[in-house]
Design a protein with these regions (language model features):
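Conserved substrate/cofactor phosphate-moiety recognition/catalytic segment
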Residues: 5, 13-53, 62
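Generic secondary-structure transition motif, activating predominantly at the C-termini of alpha-helices
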Residues: 27, 46-50, 69, 108, ...
Length: 175
């Protein structure tokens, strides 16, 4: 499903239409807002990707993140966390969704503590070079795209997603 020549980047946090629009004007970036009504599916976009960078705002783990936060607010919702985890894993296995090569967390100082614990705690602990904080400006995102670090890829999500109930907010990512 994925175009092997495209680096897939999901932008999260303070994502604006202006940032995506300006990034999309760059010759090497295809930038899309996939969370809007009527947007193409990720499968369609990945199948047609023809630029070095595909930047979009559709976090494949958004429902899992919400369920994880909900579980720590109310532990009786562990079933919701398990359902969302299995749904994400099923979507990955079916090729309906993919983990991006990178997450860019825009305006990390402006996100909620819960979002910070998820993106900069849980996800960054799994693959530190794949989750990067960046200022919420087109210029800053463009600089980051030009200097994305190399590092180990995401490990198989099955193990770490199914162990999310053991990742405690405020402790996620700490050794």
């Amino acid at each position: 499903m994925r175009s092997p020549g495209s680096t897939v980047v999901v932008v999260v946090g303070e994502v604006t239409d202006a940032i995506l629009r300006e990034l999309g004007r760059l010759p090497n970036v295809q930038a899309l807002r996939l969370t809007e009504e009527g947007a193409p599916t990720l499968r369609e976009v990945l199948g047609a990707a023809n630029r070095p960078f595909l930047v979009h705002d559709l976090d494949p783990l958004a429902a899992v993140a919400a369920a994880w936060r909900g579980f720590f607010d109310d532990p009786s919702t562990i079933g919701v966390l398990r359902v969302e985890t299995e749904s994400a894993l099923t979507a990955f296995a079916a090729g309906e969704s993919v983990l991006p090569d990178y997450y860019l967390v825009l305006d990390p100082e402006g996100i909620t503590p819960a979002e910070s614990q998820w993106w900069l705690g849980v996800l960054a602990a799994v693959a530190p070079s794949r989750v990067l904080p960046v200022e919420a400006t087109t210029a800053a995102v463009q600089r980051m795209l030009a200097s994305l670090p190399t590092g180990r890829a995401w490990p198989d999500p099955t193990g770490w997603l199914r162990g999310l109930h053991l990742q405690v907010p405020d402790r996620a990512g700490l050794l």
